[in-house]
Amino acid sequence: MAAASSSLTMRRRVLGAALLTLCLSAAALPARADVFVVVPIASTVKAMTQKELLDLYMGRSRAFPDGTFALPFDLPRDAPGRAAFYRALTGMELAQINSYWSRLMFSGQTLPPQPLPTEAAMVELVKRNPSAVGYVLQEPAADKGLRVVLVLKSSK
């Protein structure tokens, strides 16, 4: 009887620990949110389509729809915001995007968008460069010096 009780107690502890781990892991995941594609207020670009943005961020184009040079900025390879952006833009997971860029760079075809260390650094650089395009996970305030040209809806 004591062995059965001890076994039941052990199972409860293991299940409790597993449940706690699952809950904490879910809490650590980034919330599903829209991604706001931004350019500086000084930019001539007023809006973009998802296809136009896809071409910029996948290296197929280096110009905005109006023909002006575009300089896309990105977050670091493992940033949760980067994963949310590419998932919303392409429907692909970050590992697939990283693999795509590794192949293109190895073959010498093109270079990926320039990574910046943080979203705040991206905001500052985009504000100062009329050719820049970037993305943020929260809609920027009107006084931030940025214009939202596309909102990518979260796919999950």
Map each language-model feature to its residues.
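Twin-arginine (Tat) signal peptide motif
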Residues: A3-A17
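A broadly tuned "polar low-complexity/structure-edge" signature
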Residues: A2-A3, D34
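Flexible loop/hinge segments at secondary-structure junctions
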Residues: A33-K156
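Short alpha-helical segments used as structural interaction elements across diverse proteins
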Residues: L8-M10, L29, A79
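Sec/Tat signal peptide C-region and signal peptidase I cleavage site
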Residues: A27-A33
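Bacterial N-terminal signal peptides
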Residues: G16-A26
